[in-house]
Amino acid sequence: MEQYHGTTIISVRRQTPEGVQVAIGGDGQVTLGNIVVKGTARKVRKLYHGKVLAGFAGATADAFTLFERFEAKLEKHQGHLTRAAIELTKDWRTDRVLRRLEAMLAVADASASLIITGNGDVLEPEQGIVSIGSGGAYAHSAAKALLTNTELSAEEIVRKSLAIAGELCIYTNMHHTVETL
């Protein structure tokens, strides 16, 4: 799976006695080649009446196009995350314009966490951890360790994982945006 430079997006879900906690976060760095052009970008957001969390890695304009299309699919399928993701991927693979978009999405709701790629993949990683972008592997490793060995909330795990990724990945900064369900 191709990883795009310039960001880290991580989502964590944790089962607690009070219910499922879901959080997603991303850094704010935008690069153009080897130059940082913005440090405060917002790459994660809530969709579908605040019931779905989404983040992107890749070309910003492409990602916003995908967010719009994905939200339309969520509306069409009454918020069913997996169905909307599959339908978006079908369009992404078959539409001439969409096929050229260079971005990946990480999405989550109360029942599932998914990675959506332009290669036609809708992936549901194990353990409720989703990570994309150049710092994704660092954040994923940190989240896995924290999820397994601590009682931290999903939001706290996302924040700490982003901080660790920011220390290791030159394309990830320390300005983080985190959303929770």
Swiss-Prot record:
One of its GO terms (molecular function) is threonine-type endopeptidase activity. It is found in: Cytoplasm. Belongs to the peptidase T1B family. HslV subfamily. This is ATP-dependent protease subunit HslV. A double ring-shaped homohexamer of HslV is capped on each side by a ring-shaped HslU homohexamer. The assembly of the HslU/HslV complex is dependent on binding of ATP. Allosterically activated by HslU binding. GO terms for cellular component: HslUV protease complex; proteasome core complex. Keywords: Allosteric enzyme, Cytoplasm, Hydrolase, Metal-binding, Protease, Sodium, Threonine protease. SUPFAM superfamilies: N-terminal nucleophile aminohydrolases (Ntn hydrolases). Protease subunit of a proteasome-like degradation complex believed to be a general protein degrading machinery. It comes from Delftia acidovorans (strain DSM 14801 / SPH-1). Its EC number is 3.4.25.2. Gene3D superfamilies: Glutamine Phosphoribosylpyrophosphate, subunit 1, domain 1 (3.60.20.10). It catalyses: ATP-dependent cleavage of peptide bonds with broad specificity. The lineage of its organism: Bacteria, Pseudomonadati, Pseudomonadota, Betaproteobacteria, Burkholderiales. The gene is hslV. GO terms for biological process: proteolysis involved in protein catabolic process. The active site is at T7. HAMAP family: HslV. The keyword Metal-binding applies. It comes from the Bacteria. The keyword Protease applies. Na(+) binds at G166, C169, T172.
